[in-house]
Amino acid sequence: MKLVFATNNQHKLDEVRKITAGYAEIISLSDIDCHDDIPETADTLEGNALLKARYIKEKFGYDCFADDTGLEVEVLNNAPGVYSARYAGTEHDSEANMNKLLSEMNHKENRKARFRTVIALVLDGKEYTFDGIVNGSITTEKRGDSGFGYDPIFMPDTYTQTFAEMGNDTKNQISHRAKAVMKLTSFLSDYNC
C-alpha cells in the first residue's frame, strides 16, 4: 500500500518511514510534485491534520495521512499547543520558540508538559484519526543535539534525558508521534488483511 505523508518536514518523514517500514510505502509531497503551502488554519491538532490530509486527497487524488503536533504545558493552560511551530511568531523557528517557552517557564515550579500528535488518515473515502501522547516536563535549559523542535527542552516521564539527548532510535520507540504512527500501522495491518 502506498500513502502520501503530507509533510515537508524531512525529520518527520524519516521518523515515520522507519516506524512504518513493512506496513506501507510512504510517499513524500515532493514525490507527488506538491510544493503547495498547505493551510493549517484550524484551532485544534485534529482539525489541522484533517485539513492537510483532505487537501492532498482532493487536489492530487492520493490516499494520504497528515499529522499535527503540539507541546502542551500545564502551567501555561496547555500553550503553545496548536501554535507550537509558530509560538514565537515566526514559522518553524525552533530556537526562538524554545527561548520564548523557557523564558515563560522561568521561576515556574510546575514544569509538567506533554507532547501530543494527531494523525488524520484519508483512505478509500473515509477519515480516521489516531493520537499519541507522551507526558513529561520542561527542562530549565536546552540539552542535547539530536531531534528537532522542542526536543532539547522536553524530558519524558521516567527518563533522565531529553528527547534531543536520547537519540533517534530510542525516541522513535517512545515518542508521541511513534505512538500515533504505531496506531496507524496497526490499523493498516488490519485494513490490509
UniProtKB/Swiss-Prot annotation:
Active-site residue list: 68 (proton acceptor)
Assembly notes: Homodimer.
GO BP terms in the entry: nucleotide metabolic process; purine nucleoside triphosphate catabolic process
Protein name in UniProt: dITP/XTP pyrophosphatase
Source superkingdom: Bacteria
EC number: 3.6.1.66
An annotated GO cellular component: cytosol
Function summary: Pyrophosphatase that catalyzes the hydrolysis of nucleoside triphosphates to their monophosphate derivatives, with a high preference for the non-canonical purine nucleotides XTP (xanthosine triphosphate), dITP (deoxyinosine triphosphate) and ITP. Seems to function as a house-cleaning enzyme that removes non-canonical purine nucleotides from the nucleotide pool, thus preventing their incorporation into DNA/RNA and avoiding chromosomal lesions.
Source organism of the structure: Parabacteroides distasonis (strain ATCC 8503 / DSM 20701 / CIP 104284 / JCM 5825 / NCTC 11152)
Ligand binding (Mg(2+)): 68
